[in-house]
Swiss-Prot record:
It comes from the Bacteria. Belongs to the YajQ family. Keywords: Nucleotide-binding. Gene3D superfamilies: 3.30.70.860, YajQ-like, domain 2. Pfam families: DUF520. This is Nucleotide-binding protein H16_A3060. One of its GO terms (molecular function) is nucleotide binding. One of its GO terms (cellular component) is cytosol.
Length: 161
């Protein structure tokens, strides 16, 4: 019985590349000369450092621009509060969302059940497994989910025949 998983996770290699490109641009830009502006990447977390709130927003703009060029959806980013550190410097922790949340997985299952397509959807941890008798049904479910679920970037993986 064919099946696939609906997941919500960023390509971490592309995130790392986007952070490196953003840091490279920040280090060469004229308006950041002499400032300690940078973006650090650790596991599922990014930390943006800057001299003040304005420069922090500029750092985030550069990061978002580089992520968009690397085809990383910015809806994966969850911005924390801005913290003041030594002197006038500020930092902001940006966490990278991973996995389908409980509410979103329930919404996905409800959309699939309401569509009356002959597939079964089950929540499995941070993914939703969709299985059905025909591959065409699964492809129509994928198209429907791409159209109906806009609050999170969905990926489909773990295809089985």
């Amino acid at each position: 019985m064919p099946s696939f998983d609906v997941v919500c996770e960023a390509n971490m290699v592309e995130v790392k590349n986007a952070v490196e490109q953003a840091n490279k641009e920040i280090s060469t830009r004229f308006d950041f000369k002499g400032s300690d502006a940078r973006v650090e990447h650790k596991e599922n977390e990014l930390t943006a450092f800057a001299d003040d709130d304005f420069k922090l927003s500029q750092v985030k703009d550069v990061l978002i621009n580089k992520m968009a060029k690397r085809n990383v959806d910015v809806r994966f980013l969850d911005y924390g509060k801005i913290d003041k550190i030594s002197g006038d410097k500020v930092k902001q922790v940006i966490s990278i969302k991973k996995g389908v949340t409980g509410d979103l997985s329930k919404k996905i299952v409800r959309i699939i059940k309401d569509s009356k397509i002959k597939v079964q959807a089950s929540i499995q941890g941070d993914a939703v497994r969709v299985s059905g008798a025909k591959r065409d049904d699964l492809q129509s479910v994928m198209a429907m989910l791409r159209k109906d679920v806009s609050e999170a970037p969905l990926d489909f993986n773990n295809f089985r025949d």
